[in-house]
Amino acid sequence: MPGYTVLLDNDLFLAAVTKQARPILMDIAHYERALEIRSFGLPKSGRTYYRPRPARGKYVASAPGQAPAIRSGNLFRNEGLPRFVAPLTVERVIDTEYAAYLEDGVPGRLAPRPFIAPAIETVKQRFAAGQLGRF
């Protein structure tokens, strides 16, 4: 029985895959970011507070399990844009010191207000359902 060997040029293969995958990865990262930002604006069912100066007015805080409410806009404004840190690796930094506390909570002090994990889960579900392409 005749046989053959296929030799793959790793650099050429990586370049071809990268060229096709990078736009898709960037679309996915932007879609995930948009889901997070959208979750901040959803109706909240927590307590009503007065906004600190200079914003003034009232706002309804998020209840445990809901995405954070927009109070000062700092978390919303510091949702970083995605960037490539390796050929097929996208990174996005949320440059707010309390983002992790809101996402994960603080035992005995603050219940989680997740906004990252639900967005990632939505992206994973769309990916698994074959809803690829332009997000």
Regions found by a protein language model. Name each.
Residues 1-135:
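Short, Lys/Arg-rich flexible segments
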